UniProtKB/Swiss-Prot annotation:
SUPFAM superfamilies: Zn-binding ribosomal proteins. Pfam families: Ribosomal_L32p. One of its GO terms (cellular component) is large ribosomal subunit. GO terms for biological process: translation. The lineage of its organism: Bacteria, Bacillati, Bacillota, Bacilli, Bacillales. The keyword Ribosomal protein applies. Signal peptide: none annotated. InterPro entries: Ribosomal_bL32, Ribosomal_bL32_bact, Ribosomal_zn-bd. Belongs to the bacterial ribosomal protein bL32 family. Keywords: Ribonucleoprotein, Ribosomal protein. This is Large ribosomal subunit protein bL32B. It comes from the Bacteria. One of its GO terms (molecular function) is structural constituent of ribosome.
Length: 57
């Protein structure tokens, strides 16, 4: 099996890993109550989605 000829430097390794990170969830403000909620999800505070009540709060 092939083995790297030279050791990978810290800079090269870190440049390669710049995209390996955690992403923050997409949060939007609820149009009804103003609380933050996940995009495309029912608001946990007021139970509304797309201007309609879909869950009991």
């Amino acid at each position: 099996m092939a083995v790297p000829f030279r050791r990978t430097s810290k800079a090269k390794k870190r440049k390669r890993r710049t995209h390996v990170k955690l992403q923050l969830p997409g949060m939007n403000e609820c149009s009804n109550c103003g609380e933050y909620r996940l995009s495309h999800h029912v608001c946990p505070e007021c139970g509304q989605y797309d201007g309609k009540e879909v869950a009991n709060s």
